[in-house]
Amino acid sequence: MNENLRTEDTYFFGHPKGLVTLFLTEMWERMSFYGMRGLLVLFMTREITDGGMNLSAPEAMAIYGIYGASVYFLCVPGGWVADKIFGAQRTVLYGAIVITLGHYVLAIPSDKTFFLGLVLVSIGTGLLKPNISTIVGELYKPGDLRIDSGYTIFYMSINIGSMLGFLVCGYLGEKVGWHWGFGAAGVGMTFGVLQYIFTKNSLGNAGKRPNLSDKEDINKYLSTFKYASAILILFLVTGFLGIWSVDAEFL
């Protein structure tokens, strides 16, 4: 290994210290994501007496499909927001906070908060997911051969987080109560947010600034972002509610 590398650049298994921050953030985000996702269809199709929503399988799968599609669809504007407005570091933080709020809203036992929670998690994931991987790449200088192994280590966090989510949220959701499982996802994401806030200085300038220097351009993009956000939120809400047809007993 190059002896000229700074100590902080080899902190984590020979990799930059900031990789620890991103590893743990991704781990907790994936824990909350897969933990909650594993409960969705089961919760929606269970009888009301079992704490569920008593939806039919087609209705539940339709909602699940819209949620899954919206998560990946929102990654496109999420990347744009980081690139043009906030920078990747702040966008990841804002996304993590919105995800956390979404999980806690899901933990409230109400049909209305269920759909609101899904919308929040979708938006937050769209902000976080495309940008955290970008920051990983920016931790390394051009030509640094460690970048491939750095991504390998980073992607291990996805496997660890998903396993934790299925074990913790799955157990609490089925054995204790559905909303306990959703709440556990929120607690996990809270850990992720806190550790990101307290250790994000280790990221240095990686993903810190958007690719804009002109203040007028920034204001223009902020204005566009506000209108686009309103349209996206309206689309998600009407999409979820449009397929939610339940009988009078449930209402």
Q: Predicted segment positions?
A:
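Intracellular juxtamembrane helix-capping segments at the cytosolic ends
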Residues: L127-P142
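Central cavity-lining transmembrane alpha-helices of secondary-active solute carriers
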Residues: M61-A82, K129, M163
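Cytoplasmic membrane-interface "Motif A"-like loop-to-helix N-cap segments
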Residues: K84-A96, G143-D144
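C-terminal ends and interior cores of transmembrane alpha-helices
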Residues: Y94-F115
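A gly/Pro-rich, aromatic-decorated transmembrane alpha-helix motif that marks the paired
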Residues: R37-G38, P77, I160-V176
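Intracellular loop-helix junctions on the cytosolic face of multi-pass helical membrane proteins
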Residues: M1-H15, P142, G170-L251
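Short amphipathic helix-loop junctions that connect adjacent transmembrane helices
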Residues: G38-E59, S245-L251
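Hydrophobic core of transmembrane alpha-helices in multi-pass small-molecule transporters
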Residues: M27, G102, T113-L128
